[in-house]
Amino acid sequence: MKYQELVDVYSALENTTKRLEKTQIISNFLLKLDSTTLEQVGLLILGSIFPAWSDKEIGIGNKLVMQAVGEAVGVTPDKVEDAVRDQGDIGLACISLYAKKSQTTFFSQPLTIDFVFKSLRKLSEKSGARSTKRKIDIILEMLSQASASEAKYLTRTILEELRIGVGEGVVRDAIAQAFNIDKSVVERAMMLTNDLGLIAVVAKEKGEGGLKELNLTPGTPVKPMLAQLAPPIPEIINEMGVAICETKYDGIRLQVHRHSDEIKIFTRRLENITHALPEIVDLFNEYLPHEDYIVEGEVIATRDGNPLSFQNILHRVRRKHNIDEAMEQVPLKVFLFDLLYYIVPMIDEPLLKRRKKLEEIVNTTPDEINLSNMVYGTPDTIKEVEDLFELSIAQHHEGIMIKDAGEPYIPGLRGKKMLKYKAEPETLDMVVVGGTYGIGKRGDFVGSYLVSLRDEDNNLKTVAYVATGLDDATLEYLTKKMKEYELSTKGREIVVEPKIVLEVAFSEIVESPEYETGYSLRFPVVKNIRKDKGVDDIDTVERLISMYETQ
Protein backbone atom coordinates (compact mmCIF):
# COMPACT_ATOMS: atom_id res chain seq x y z
CA MET A 1 0.00 0.00 0.00
CA LYS A 2 1.22 3.50 -0.83
CA TYR A 3 2.54 5.60 2.03
CA GLN A 4 0.46 8.49 0.68
CA GLU A 5 -2.69 6.66 1.78
CA LEU A 6 -1.42 6.59 5.37
CA VAL A 7 -0.41 10.24 5.03
CA ASP A 8 -3.98 11.11 3.99
CA VAL A 9 -5.15 9.42 7.20
CA TYR A 10 -2.61 11.41 9.23
CA SER A 11 -3.89 14.62 7.66
CA ALA A 12 -7.53 13.79 8.35
CA LEU A 13 -6.68 12.98 11.97
CA GLU A 14 -4.73 16.19 12.41
CA ASN A 15 -7.63 18.22 11.05
CA THR A 16 -10.21 17.08 13.62
CA THR A 17 -10.23 17.35 17.40
CA LYS A 18 -13.23 15.03 17.82
CA ARG A 19 -12.35 11.68 19.34
CA LEU A 20 -15.19 9.79 17.66
CA GLU A 21 -14.18 11.12 14.25
CA LYS A 22 -10.57 10.09 14.84
CA THR A 23 -11.71 6.62 15.89
CA GLN A 24 -13.87 6.26 12.76
CA ILE A 25 -11.08 7.42 10.44
CA ILE A 26 -8.61 4.89 11.85
CA SER A 27 -11.18 2.10 12.00
CA ASN A 28 -12.09 2.52 8.33
CA PHE A 29 -8.42 2.49 7.35
CA LEU A 30 -7.56 -0.62 9.37
CA LEU A 31 -10.20 -2.61 7.48
CA LYS A 32 -8.34 -1.99 4.21
CA LEU A 33 -5.04 -3.50 5.36
CA ASP A 34 -3.49 -6.93 5.01
CA SER A 35 -1.95 -8.40 8.16
CA THR A 36 1.64 -7.30 7.44
CA THR A 37 0.65 -3.70 6.77
CA LEU A 38 -1.80 -3.76 9.68
CA GLU A 39 0.98 -4.63 12.12
CA GLN A 40 3.11 -1.79 10.76
CA VAL A 41 0.28 0.75 10.84
CA GLY A 42 -0.60 -0.27 14.41
CA LEU A 43 2.73 1.29 15.36
CA LEU A 44 3.05 4.04 12.73
CA ILE A 45 -0.34 5.54 13.61
CA LEU A 46 1.23 6.50 16.97
CA GLY A 47 4.42 7.74 15.31
CA SER A 48 6.37 4.64 16.39
CA ILE A 49 8.16 1.79 14.65
CA PHE A 50 8.77 -0.36 17.73
CA PRO A 51 6.50 -1.37 20.62
CA ALA A 52 6.70 0.96 23.61
CA TRP A 53 8.78 -1.52 25.61
CA SER A 54 11.45 -2.09 22.96
CA ASP A 55 14.91 -0.74 23.76
CA LYS A 56 15.44 -0.01 20.06
CA GLU A 57 15.02 3.56 18.88
CA ILE A 58 15.53 5.61 15.74
CA GLY A 59 17.92 7.89 17.59
CA ILE A 60 18.01 10.73 15.05
CA GLY A 61 18.37 14.37 16.07
CA ASN A 62 16.91 17.52 14.56
CA LYS A 63 20.12 18.62 12.84
CA LEU A 64 20.55 15.33 10.97
CA VAL A 65 16.98 15.45 9.69
CA MET A 66 17.37 19.09 8.65
CA GLN A 67 20.55 18.18 6.77
CA ALA A 68 18.74 15.41 4.90
CA VAL A 69 15.79 17.68 4.10
CA GLY A 70 18.21 20.29 2.76
CA GLU A 71 19.85 17.76 0.45
CA ALA A 72 16.46 16.50 -0.73
CA VAL A 73 15.20 19.94 -1.74
CA GLY A 74 18.52 21.51 -2.71
CA VAL A 75 19.01 24.09 0.04
CA THR A 76 21.47 24.50 2.89
CA PRO A 77 20.73 23.18 6.40
CA ASP A 78 20.62 26.83 7.55
CA LYS A 79 17.71 27.45 5.17
CA VAL A 80 15.92 24.43 6.59
CA GLU A 81 16.55 25.67 10.12
CA ASP A 82 15.13 29.08 9.16
CA ALA A 83 12.02 27.39 7.75
CA VAL A 84 11.57 25.34 10.92
CA ARG A 85 11.89 28.49 13.01
CA ASP A 86 9.36 30.32 10.81
CA GLN A 87 6.86 27.45 10.71
CA GLY A 88 7.43 26.18 14.25
CA ASP A 89 7.64 22.55 13.11
CA ILE A 90 9.83 20.38 10.85
CA GLY A 91 6.76 18.97 9.10
CA LEU A 92 5.30 22.34 8.17
CA ALA A 93 8.77 23.48 7.12
CA CYS A 94 8.85 20.56 4.64
CA ILE A 95 5.57 21.71 3.10
CA SER A 96 7.09 25.16 2.53
CA LEU A 97 10.44 23.89 1.27
CA TYR A 98 9.05 21.24 -1.07
CA ALA A 99 6.90 23.89 -2.74
CA LYS A 100 10.14 25.60 -3.81
CA LYS A 101 12.06 22.39 -4.51
CA SER A 102 14.79 22.95 -7.08
CA GLN A 103 15.77 19.31 -7.59
CA THR A 104 13.71 16.75 -9.47
CA THR A 105 13.97 13.01 -8.91
CA PHE A 106 13.50 11.09 -12.14
CA PHE A 107 11.93 7.62 -12.34
CA SER A 108 11.17 7.60 -8.62
CA GLN A 109 8.75 5.00 -7.33
CA PRO A 110 5.93 5.99 -4.96
CA LEU A 111 6.79 5.35 -1.34
CA THR A 112 5.05 2.36 0.22
CA ILE A 113 4.19 1.83 3.88
CA ASP A 114 6.34 -1.29 3.92
CA PHE A 115 9.37 0.50 2.44
CA VAL A 116 9.07 3.42 4.87
CA PHE A 117 8.60 1.15 7.88
CA LYS A 118 11.60 -1.03 7.03
CA SER A 119 13.76 1.99 6.19
CA LEU A 120 12.94 3.61 9.52
CA ARG A 121 13.88 0.40 11.33
CA LYS A 122 17.20 0.36 9.47
CA LEU A 123 18.00 3.72 11.08
CA SER A 124 18.02 2.08 14.50
CA GLU A 125 20.52 -0.54 13.33
CA LYS A 126 23.21 1.86 12.12
CA SER A 127 26.08 2.60 14.49
CA GLY A 128 29.81 3.11 14.33
CA ALA A 129 32.18 5.48 12.57
CA ARG A 130 30.21 5.92 9.32
CA SER A 131 26.75 5.60 10.79
CA THR A 132 25.84 9.28 10.38
CA LYS A 133 26.37 9.19 6.62
CA ARG A 134 24.48 5.90 6.32
CA LYS A 135 21.56 7.32 8.28
CA ILE A 136 21.43 10.43 6.11
CA ASP A 137 21.49 8.23 3.00
CA ILE A 138 18.52 6.21 4.28
CA ILE A 139 16.52 9.34 5.14
CA LEU A 140 17.48 10.99 1.85
CA GLU A 141 16.35 7.96 -0.14
CA MET A 142 12.88 8.36 1.36
CA LEU A 143 12.72 12.16 1.20
CA SER A 144 13.89 12.25 -2.42
CA GLN A 145 10.87 10.15 -3.43
CA ALA A 146 8.44 11.88 -1.08
CA SER A 147 5.74 14.40 -1.84
CA ALA A 148 5.53 17.48 0.37
CA SER A 149 2.82 15.93 2.54
CA GLU A 150 4.73 12.65 2.80
CA ALA A 151 7.87 14.53 3.85
CA LYS A 152 5.84 16.38 6.48
CA TYR A 153 4.84 13.23 8.34
CA LEU A 154 7.97 11.26 7.51
CA THR A 155 10.23 13.80 9.23
CA ARG A 156 7.88 14.03 12.19
CA THR A 157 7.93 10.24 12.53
CA ILE A 158 11.73 10.16 12.42
CA LEU A 159 11.82 12.71 15.25
CA GLU A 160 8.98 10.91 17.09
CA GLU A 161 6.79 14.03 16.96
CA LEU A 162 3.82 12.97 14.81
CA ARG A 163 1.46 15.51 16.40
CA ILE A 164 -1.87 14.27 15.03
CA GLY A 165 -3.68 14.09 18.38
CA VAL A 166 -3.92 10.31 18.55
CA GLY A 167 -3.10 8.29 21.64
CA GLU A 168 -3.32 4.62 22.51
CA GLY A 169 -6.93 4.97 23.65
CA VAL A 170 -8.13 6.14 20.23
CA VAL A 171 -6.28 3.32 18.45
CA ARG A 172 -7.68 0.82 20.96
CA ASP A 173 -11.22 1.99 20.23
CA ALA A 174 -10.56 1.92 16.47
CA ILE A 175 -9.37 -1.70 16.62
CA ALA A 176 -12.43 -2.65 18.68
CA GLN A 177 -14.75 -0.90 16.22
CA ALA A 178 -13.06 -2.24 13.07
CA PHE A 179 -13.13 -5.88 14.13
CA ASN A 180 -16.32 -5.79 16.26
CA ILE A 181 -14.62 -6.60 19.57
CA ASP A 182 -15.50 -5.37 23.06
CA LYS A 183 -13.30 -2.43 24.06
CA SER A 184 -12.46 -4.00 27.40
CA VAL A 185 -10.97 -7.04 25.65
CA VAL A 186 -8.75 -4.85 23.47
CA GLU A 187 -7.83 -2.77 26.52
CA ARG A 188 -6.71 -5.82 28.49
CA ALA A 189 -4.69 -7.13 25.54
CA MET A 190 -3.02 -3.73 25.22
CA MET A 191 -2.11 -3.58 28.90
CA LEU A 192 -0.62 -7.09 28.76
CA THR A 193 1.36 -6.82 25.51
CA ASN A 194 1.85 -3.08 24.92
CA ASP A 195 2.01 -3.80 21.19
CA LEU A 196 -0.88 -2.34 19.19
CA GLY A 197 0.52 -3.77 15.97
CA LEU A 198 0.28 -7.29 17.36
CA ILE A 199 -3.16 -6.61 18.84
CA ALA A 200 -4.52 -5.32 15.52
CA VAL A 201 -3.32 -8.43 13.66
CA VAL A 202 -4.70 -10.84 16.28
CA ALA A 203 -8.02 -8.96 16.26
CA LYS A 204 -8.22 -9.26 12.46
CA GLU A 205 -7.14 -12.91 12.23
CA LYS A 206 -8.53 -14.48 15.42
CA GLY A 207 -11.11 -12.03 16.72
CA GLU A 208 -12.11 -11.58 20.35
CA GLY A 209 -11.16 -15.14 21.26
CA GLY A 210 -7.63 -14.63 20.00
CA LEU A 211 -7.20 -11.45 22.03
CA LYS A 212 -8.44 -13.20 25.16
CA GLU A 213 -5.69 -15.78 24.71
CA LEU A 214 -2.97 -13.11 24.88
CA ASN A 215 -1.37 -13.09 28.30
CA LEU A 216 1.70 -12.09 30.23
CA THR A 217 5.00 -13.14 28.72
CA PRO A 218 8.19 -12.78 30.76
CA GLY A 219 10.46 -10.44 28.84
CA THR A 220 7.59 -8.23 27.67
CA PRO A 221 6.70 -5.58 30.29
CA VAL A 222 3.14 -4.97 31.42
CA LYS A 223 1.68 -1.59 32.33
CA PRO A 224 1.69 -1.21 36.11
CA MET A 225 -1.39 -1.09 38.28
CA LEU A 226 -1.62 2.46 39.61
CA ALA A 227 -2.57 4.02 42.94
CA GLN A 228 -4.81 6.94 43.75
CA LEU A 229 -4.90 9.14 46.83
CA ALA A 230 -6.28 7.44 49.96
CA PRO A 231 -8.91 8.90 52.30
CA PRO A 232 -8.26 8.58 56.08
CA ILE A 233 -6.83 5.19 57.07
CA PRO A 234 -9.81 3.94 59.15
CA GLU A 235 -12.24 4.73 56.35
CA ILE A 236 -10.36 2.81 53.67
CA ILE A 237 -9.49 -0.18 55.89
CA ASN A 238 -13.13 -0.55 56.93
CA GLU A 239 -14.17 -0.39 53.28
CA MET A 240 -11.63 -3.00 52.09
CA GLY A 241 -12.06 -5.37 55.03
CA VAL A 242 -8.60 -6.92 54.59
CA ALA A 243 -5.77 -4.86 53.16
CA ILE A 244 -2.06 -5.31 52.59
CA CYS A 245 -0.38 -2.15 53.86
CA GLU A 246 3.23 -1.49 52.85
CA THR A 247 5.85 1.20 53.15
CA LYS A 248 5.80 3.55 50.14
CA TYR A 249 9.41 3.96 49.06
CA ASP A 250 10.78 7.04 47.28
CA GLY A 251 12.45 5.24 44.41
CA ILE A 252 11.86 3.88 40.93
CA ARG A 253 9.24 1.22 40.39
CA LEU A 254 10.66 -1.84 38.67
CA GLN A 255 9.41 -4.91 36.88
CA VAL A 256 12.04 -7.65 36.89
CA HIS A 257 11.53 -10.38 34.29
CA ARG A 258 13.28 -13.72 34.02
CA HIS A 259 12.85 -15.73 30.84
CA SER A 260 15.09 -18.55 29.61
CA ASP A 261 17.88 -17.56 32.01
CA GLU A 262 17.84 -13.93 30.86
CA ILE A 263 16.91 -11.16 33.30
CA LYS A 264 15.48 -7.86 32.12
CA ILE A 265 14.55 -4.85 34.25
CA PHE A 266 11.90 -2.35 33.15
CA THR A 267 10.60 0.93 34.58
CA ARG A 268 6.95 1.90 34.95
CA ARG A 269 7.28 3.51 31.50
CA LEU A 270 8.37 0.14 30.08
CA GLU A 271 11.93 1.37 29.55
CA ASN A 272 14.59 -1.34 29.63
CA ILE A 273 17.23 -0.30 32.20
CA THR A 274 18.93 -3.67 32.69
CA HIS A 275 22.29 -2.28 31.56
CA ALA A 276 22.30 0.33 34.34
CA LEU A 277 21.69 -2.11 37.20
CA PRO A 278 24.12 -5.04 36.86
CA GLU A 279 24.24 -5.64 40.62
CA ILE A 280 20.45 -6.03 40.69
CA VAL A 281 20.69 -8.63 37.93
CA ASP A 282 23.30 -10.48 39.99
CA LEU A 283 21.06 -10.40 43.08
CA PHE A 284 18.13 -11.88 41.20
CA ASN A 285 20.31 -14.55 39.64
CA GLU A 286 21.52 -15.62 43.06
CA TYR A 287 18.56 -15.13 45.39
CA LEU A 288 15.48 -15.95 43.27
CA PRO A 289 14.63 -19.28 41.62
CA HIS A 290 15.77 -20.02 38.09
CA GLU A 291 12.19 -20.19 36.82
CA ASP A 292 10.35 -17.78 34.54
CA TYR A 293 8.88 -14.94 36.62
CA ILE A 294 7.81 -11.30 36.71
CA VAL A 295 8.22 -9.56 40.06
CA GLU A 296 7.49 -5.97 40.91
CA GLY A 297 9.23 -3.74 43.40
CA GLU A 298 10.93 -0.44 44.12
CA VAL A 299 14.65 0.30 43.94
CA ILE A 300 16.04 3.08 46.13
CA ALA A 301 19.43 4.71 46.53
CA THR A 302 21.02 4.52 49.98
CA ARG A 303 23.89 5.94 51.99
CA ASP A 304 24.93 4.40 55.32
CA GLY A 305 21.74 2.36 55.19
CA ASN A 306 19.48 5.43 54.89
CA PRO A 307 17.37 6.22 51.80
CA LEU A 308 18.50 9.03 49.52
CA SER A 309 16.20 11.23 47.46
CA PHE A 310 14.48 10.12 44.28
CA GLN A 311 16.87 12.21 42.19
CA ASN A 312 19.82 10.06 43.32
CA ILE A 313 18.33 6.84 42.02
CA LEU A 314 17.19 8.59 38.85
CA HIS A 315 20.73 9.76 38.08
CA ARG A 316 21.95 6.24 38.70
CA VAL A 317 19.42 4.66 36.34
CA ARG A 318 20.15 7.24 33.63
CA ARG A 319 23.88 6.50 33.76
CA LYS A 320 25.11 4.96 30.50
CA HIS A 321 28.86 4.92 31.16
CA ASN A 322 31.16 4.19 34.12
CA ILE A 323 28.55 1.92 35.67
CA ASP A 324 31.10 0.35 38.06
CA GLU A 325 31.92 3.78 39.46
CA ALA A 326 28.21 4.56 39.84
CA MET A 327 27.68 1.28 41.71
CA GLU A 328 30.22 2.38 44.32
CA GLN A 329 28.89 5.94 44.58
CA VAL A 330 25.18 5.06 44.73
CA PRO A 331 24.45 1.72 46.48
CA LEU A 332 21.00 0.32 45.82
CA LYS A 333 18.35 -1.61 47.71
CA VAL A 334 15.38 -3.40 46.19
CA PHE A 335 12.05 -3.85 47.97
CA LEU A 336 9.75 -6.40 46.28
CA PHE A 337 5.99 -6.26 46.73
CA ASP A 338 4.20 -8.22 44.00
CA LEU A 339 4.49 -11.34 41.87
CA LEU A 340 2.76 -11.19 38.48
CA TYR A 341 4.10 -14.38 36.95
CA TYR A 342 5.74 -17.48 38.36
CA ILE A 343 5.93 -20.35 35.87
CA VAL A 344 2.36 -19.34 34.91
CA PRO A 345 0.55 -15.96 34.95
CA MET A 346 -0.65 -14.92 38.42
CA ILE A 347 -2.29 -11.54 37.84
CA ASP A 348 -5.79 -12.99 38.13
CA GLU A 349 -4.98 -14.40 41.57
CA PRO A 350 -5.84 -12.29 44.66
CA LEU A 351 -3.04 -10.11 46.01
CA LEU A 352 -2.88 -12.13 49.23
CA LYS A 353 -1.99 -15.29 47.30
CA ARG A 354 0.54 -13.45 45.13
CA ARG A 355 2.21 -11.94 48.20
CA LYS A 356 2.50 -15.28 50.00
CA LYS A 357 4.04 -16.90 46.92
CA LEU A 358 6.49 -14.01 46.65
CA GLU A 359 7.52 -14.57 50.26
CA GLU A 360 8.13 -18.24 49.45
CA ILE A 361 10.45 -17.69 46.50
CA VAL A 362 12.57 -14.69 47.56
CA ASN A 363 15.69 -15.26 49.62
CA THR A 364 16.19 -12.04 51.57
CA THR A 365 19.53 -13.01 53.11
CA PRO A 366 21.48 -10.08 51.59
CA ASP A 367 20.66 -6.58 52.81
CA GLU A 368 20.26 -5.38 49.21
CA ILE A 369 17.14 -7.43 48.43
CA ASN A 370 14.05 -7.22 50.64
CA LEU A 371 10.32 -7.68 50.75
CA SER A 372 8.39 -4.47 51.33
CA ASN A 373 7.72 -3.73 55.00
CA MET A 374 4.11 -4.86 55.44
CA VAL A 375 1.25 -5.29 57.91
CA TYR A 376 -2.23 -6.67 57.36
CA GLY A 377 -4.91 -4.05 57.71
CA THR A 378 -8.29 -5.04 59.17
CA PRO A 379 -10.84 -3.10 61.22
CA ASP A 380 -9.13 -4.59 64.31
CA THR A 381 -5.56 -3.58 63.29
CA ILE A 382 -6.01 0.04 62.24
CA LYS A 383 -3.56 1.12 64.96
CA GLU A 384 -0.89 -1.14 63.43
CA VAL A 385 -1.46 0.45 60.02
CA GLU A 386 -1.15 3.94 61.52
CA ASP A 387 2.03 2.84 63.30
CA LEU A 388 3.46 1.59 59.99
CA PHE A 389 2.73 4.98 58.47
CA GLU A 390 4.53 6.79 61.32
CA LEU A 391 7.47 4.39 61.06
CA SER A 392 7.71 4.89 57.30
CA ILE A 393 7.82 8.66 57.70
CA ALA A 394 10.41 8.37 60.50
CA GLN A 395 12.57 6.28 58.16
CA HIS A 396 12.38 9.04 55.51
CA HIS A 397 10.04 7.17 53.19
CA GLU A 398 6.98 8.72 51.50
CA GLY A 399 4.16 7.05 53.43
CA ILE A 400 2.29 3.79 52.90
CA MET A 401 0.44 1.89 50.19
CA ILE A 402 -2.93 0.32 51.04
CA LYS A 403 -4.04 -2.50 48.72
CA ASP A 404 -7.16 -4.65 48.75
CA ALA A 405 -5.89 -8.15 49.64
CA GLY A 406 -8.59 -9.90 47.62
CA GLU A 407 -8.04 -8.11 44.33
CA PRO A 408 -6.34 -9.32 41.13
CA TYR A 409 -3.63 -7.25 39.45
CA ILE A 410 -5.23 -5.03 36.82
CA PRO A 411 -2.56 -3.56 34.50
CA GLY A 412 -2.85 0.14 33.80
CA LEU A 413 -5.76 0.65 36.21
CA ARG A 414 -5.84 3.53 38.68
CA GLY A 415 -8.64 2.79 41.12
CA LYS A 416 -9.78 2.34 44.70
CA LYS A 417 -8.16 -1.07 45.13
CA MET A 418 -4.64 0.37 45.38
CA LEU A 419 -4.22 3.58 47.36
CA LYS A 420 -1.36 5.75 48.59
CA TYR A 421 -1.32 7.59 51.89
CA LYS A 422 1.38 10.26 52.08
CA ALA A 423 2.51 12.85 54.61
CA GLU A 424 3.60 15.35 51.98
CA PRO A 425 1.10 17.67 50.24
CA GLU A 426 -0.57 16.00 47.29
CA THR A 427 1.12 16.56 43.95
CA LEU A 428 0.23 16.40 40.28
CA ASP A 429 2.52 15.33 37.46
CA MET A 430 2.17 17.93 34.71
CA VAL A 431 3.88 18.57 31.40
CA VAL A 432 5.49 21.88 30.47
CA VAL A 433 4.03 23.46 27.31
CA GLY A 434 5.53 26.93 27.57
CA GLY A 435 7.19 29.48 29.78
CA THR A 436 8.34 33.03 30.34
CA TYR A 437 11.91 34.28 30.51
CA GLY A 438 12.87 36.20 33.62
CA ILE A 439 14.01 39.81 33.81
CA GLY A 440 17.15 41.43 35.14
CA LYS A 441 19.79 39.00 36.39
CA ARG A 442 17.58 36.05 35.43
CA GLY A 443 16.84 37.30 31.94
CA ASP A 444 18.71 34.38 30.37
CA PHE A 445 16.60 31.79 32.22
CA VAL A 446 13.04 30.63 31.73
CA GLY A 447 11.74 31.49 35.18
CA SER A 448 8.06 30.60 34.97
CA TYR A 449 6.66 27.39 33.45
CA LEU A 450 3.20 26.87 31.96
CA VAL A 451 2.02 23.36 32.82
CA SER A 452 -0.81 21.20 31.48
CA LEU A 453 -2.83 18.08 32.25
CA ARG A 454 -4.48 15.55 29.89
CA ASP A 455 -8.21 15.60 29.20
CA GLU A 456 -10.24 12.49 28.31
CA ASP A 457 -9.29 12.86 24.63
CA ASN A 458 -5.58 13.13 25.48
CA ASN A 459 -5.55 16.83 24.61
CA LEU A 460 -3.37 19.02 26.83
CA LYS A 461 -5.13 21.66 28.94
CA THR A 462 -3.25 24.37 30.83
CA VAL A 463 -3.69 24.64 34.59
CA ALA A 464 -1.02 26.95 36.05
CA TYR A 465 2.27 28.77 35.82
CA VAL A 466 4.82 27.51 38.35
CA ALA A 467 7.89 29.53 39.25
CA THR A 468 8.98 28.44 42.73
CA GLY A 469 10.97 25.50 44.01
CA LEU A 470 13.75 25.98 41.45
CA ASP A 471 17.35 26.80 42.30
CA ASP A 472 19.79 28.32 39.78
CA ALA A 473 21.20 24.96 38.67
CA THR A 474 17.69 23.62 38.01
CA LEU A 475 16.70 26.79 36.15
CA GLU A 476 19.79 26.45 33.98
CA TYR A 477 18.99 22.81 33.22
CA LEU A 478 15.32 23.49 32.46
CA THR A 479 16.15 26.48 30.25
CA LYS A 480 18.54 24.32 28.23
CA LYS A 481 15.79 21.73 27.79
CA MET A 482 13.23 24.40 26.87
CA LYS A 483 15.52 25.64 24.10
CA GLU A 484 16.00 22.06 22.90
CA TYR A 485 12.23 21.54 22.64
CA GLU A 486 11.38 25.07 21.47
CA LEU A 487 8.55 25.42 18.96
CA SER A 488 8.33 29.21 18.90
CA THR A 489 9.38 32.32 20.82
CA LYS A 490 7.69 35.71 20.99
CA GLY A 491 9.22 38.35 23.24
CA ARG A 492 9.79 36.70 26.61
CA GLU A 493 7.30 33.90 25.90
CA ILE A 494 8.41 30.47 24.69
CA VAL A 495 6.27 27.56 23.46
CA VAL A 496 7.75 24.06 23.66
CA GLU A 497 7.00 20.46 22.80
CA PRO A 498 5.36 18.58 25.71
CA LYS A 499 8.46 16.71 26.84
CA ILE A 500 9.33 17.97 30.35
CA VAL A 501 7.27 16.52 33.21
CA LEU A 502 7.24 18.32 36.57
CA GLU A 503 5.86 17.04 39.86
CA VAL A 504 4.10 20.06 41.34
CA ALA A 505 2.86 20.44 44.92
CA PHE A 506 0.23 23.03 45.85
CA SER A 507 -1.91 24.22 48.74
CA GLU A 508 -5.30 24.33 47.04
CA ILE A 509 -7.16 23.95 43.74
CA VAL A 510 -9.31 26.93 42.78
CA GLU A 511 -11.65 27.71 39.89
CA SER A 512 -10.06 29.99 37.29
CA PRO A 513 -11.19 31.07 33.80
CA GLU A 514 -7.57 31.99 33.04
CA TYR A 515 -6.56 28.41 32.23
CA GLU A 516 -8.01 25.84 29.83
CA THR A 517 -8.94 23.38 32.58
CA GLY A 518 -11.11 26.00 34.28
CA TYR A 519 -9.02 25.58 37.43
CA SER A 520 -5.71 26.75 38.82
CA LEU A 521 -3.37 25.96 41.71
CA ARG A 522 -2.62 28.12 44.74
CA PHE A 523 1.06 28.34 45.70
CA PRO A 524 2.37 25.76 43.21
CA VAL A 525 5.91 24.52 43.91
CA VAL A 526 8.08 22.26 41.75
CA LYS A 527 8.95 19.19 43.82
CA ASN A 528 10.75 17.15 41.17
CA ILE A 529 11.65 16.98 37.51
CA ARG A 530 10.18 13.60 36.58
CA LYS A 531 12.68 12.38 34.00
CA ASP A 532 11.21 8.91 34.40
CA LYS A 533 7.85 10.09 33.03
CA GLY A 534 6.57 11.31 29.68
CA VAL A 535 3.45 13.10 28.49
CA ASP A 536 1.48 9.82 28.55
CA ASP A 537 2.19 9.49 32.29
CA ILE A 538 0.96 12.90 33.44
CA ASP A 539 -2.15 13.34 35.53
CA THR A 540 -5.57 14.06 34.09
CA VAL A 541 -8.06 16.90 34.23
CA GLU A 542 -10.50 14.35 35.67
CA ARG A 543 -8.17 13.75 38.62
CA LEU A 544 -7.76 17.51 39.12
CA ILE A 545 -11.53 17.93 39.28
CA SER A 546 -11.88 14.95 41.64
CA MET A 547 -9.27 16.45 43.97
CA TYR A 548 -11.02 19.83 43.79
CA GLU A 549 -14.36 18.29 44.77
CA THR A 550 -12.93 16.39 47.75
CA GLN A 551 -10.45 18.95 49.13
Swiss-Prot record:
Which residues of this UniProt protein bind ATP? E246, R253, R268, E298, F337, R414, K420
- Active site annotation, chain numbering: K248
Task: Quote the protein name from its UniProt record.
Answer: DNA ligase
Please tell me the species this chain comes from: Methanobrevibacter smithii (strain ATCC 35061 / DSM 861 / OCM 144 / PS)
Q: What does this protein do?
A: DNA ligase that seals nicks in double-stranded DNA during DNA replication, DNA recombination and DNA repair.
Family of this protein: Belongs to the ATP-dependent DNA ligase family.
Pfam families to which the protein is assigned, alphabetical: DNA_ligase_A_C (PF04679), DNA_ligase_A_M (PF01068), DNA_ligase_A_N (PF04675)
Q: Name one GO biological process term.
A: DNA repair
Source organism, top-level taxon: Archaea
Q: Which cofactors is this protein said to need?
A: Mg(2+)
Give the Gene Ontology MF terms in alphabetical order.
ATP binding; DNA binding; DNA ligase (ATP) activity; metal ion binding
Which reactions appear under catalytic activity for this entry? ATP + (deoxyribonucleotide)n-3'-hydroxyl + 5'-phospho-(deoxyribonucleotide)m = (deoxyribonucleotide)n+m + AMP + diphosphate
EC numbers, comma separated = 6.5.1.1
Q: What CDD domains would the database entry show?
A: Adenylation_DNA_ligase_Arch_LigB, OBF_DNA_ligase_Arch_LigB
Keyword annotations of the record: ATP-binding, Cell cycle, Cell division, DNA damage, DNA recombination, DNA repair, DNA replication, Ligase, Magnesium, Metal-binding, Nucleotide-binding
